Each structure stands twice: as C-alpha cells, then as structure tokens.
C-alpha cells in the first residue's frame, strides 16, 4: 500500500466565529464524533512519521448527494428538509437557524479523493474539501422553499449539544 486517504471532518474546527476555515486554524472539537475524527488524523500523522506510510487527511464539509441516508439526523439536512417541505411538514431547526454550513456535493468529494491519492506533496497533509460559500440553515430552508414552490416555516427546537 502506497497511500491512505482518510475521511476526516470539518467538525474538528469546532464552533468558530468565522465561516472560512483554513487547515492551519486552531482545532476545538466539541463532540465525541469530532474528537474521534481528529484523533484518527493524529494516528495518520504518526504512521506517516514513524513508518513512512503516506497518509492524506481530507476534512470534508457537509457532504450531500445521491445515496445519502435521508434519515440521518446530523448529515442529511438537505434530503430531510426536502422530504418535509414536499409533505407540508414543518422541518425542525435546532437553535436559531443561524448556524452556517458549507454544503459539498458528493462528486466533489470523490474528485478530491482521487486527486489526494496521487498528488505529489500531499503525503502527511490535512486538506479541506469544501465548496464555499457557507449558508445558514435558514438560508438553506428559504432556498429549498423557493426551488420547490413551497412556503413551509421551520419549527425551532433547542440547540443540540456539540452541534456547530
């Protein structure tokens, strides 16, 4: 095996007040999931430094697209919102809806993985895979309402612990 490409997560950044994230930014995971993803990045670096195994950690940002589990409460906000809107059911927004997301289409994730597998100079690196710009959940909901020709308002619930 020449190189391992690891599926890391933007959740490693935690809840930063700025939307653009850079690989050199401070890390502050807020959930066990985020901490586990970051710990795995450290394992990748350790294997690279200790054994020379080439590793590349790709930090994915809110992946969406075909074959996504529409029932996942954390990673499927787009299909979940669409299903609710088409059914006339108010989608739940945790918190005030001002939390922002950089939604990245699955084809871009696949392309990033293929590039990381062969790119010279990528070994030992952490690379963000995102599209930019970020959208708040309320902006996403408004855009989906517009595209679908619906006008369903969200139901707000308390913010989830560890949600960024």
Language model features with spans:
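N-terminal Rossmann-like NAD(P)+-binding domain of SDR-like oxidoreductases, especially those catalyzing
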Residues: 1-63, 146
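Active-site proximal helix/loop that lines the substrate pocket
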Residues: 9-15, 62-68, 98, 118, ...
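Short, glycine/charged-enriched secondary-structure capping and boundary segments
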Residues: 18-22, 71-75, 106-108, 142-144
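Short-chain dehydrogenase/reductase
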Residues: 25, 30-41, 72-79, 102-103, ...
């Amino acid at each position: 095996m020449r190189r391992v490409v690891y599926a890391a997560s933007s959740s490693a950044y935690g809840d930063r007040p700025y939307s653009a994230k850079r690989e050199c930014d401070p890390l502050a995971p807020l959930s066990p999931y985020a901490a586990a993803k970051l710990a795995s990045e450290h394992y990748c670096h350790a294997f690279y430094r200790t054994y020379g195994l080439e590793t590349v950690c790709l930090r994915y940002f809110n992946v969406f697209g075909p074959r996504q589990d529409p029932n996942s409460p954390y990673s499927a906000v787009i299909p979940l919102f669409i299903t609710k809107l088409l059914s006339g059911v108010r989608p739940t927004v945790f918190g005030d809806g001002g939390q922002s997301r950089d939604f990245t289409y699955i084809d871009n994730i696949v392309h990033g993985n293929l590039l990381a597998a062969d790119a010279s100079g990528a070994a030992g690196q952490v690379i963000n895979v995102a599209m930019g710009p970020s959208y708040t959940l309320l902006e996403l909901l408004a855009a989906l309402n517009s595209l679908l020709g619906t006008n369903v308002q969200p139901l707000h619930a308390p913010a989830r612990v560890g949600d960024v």
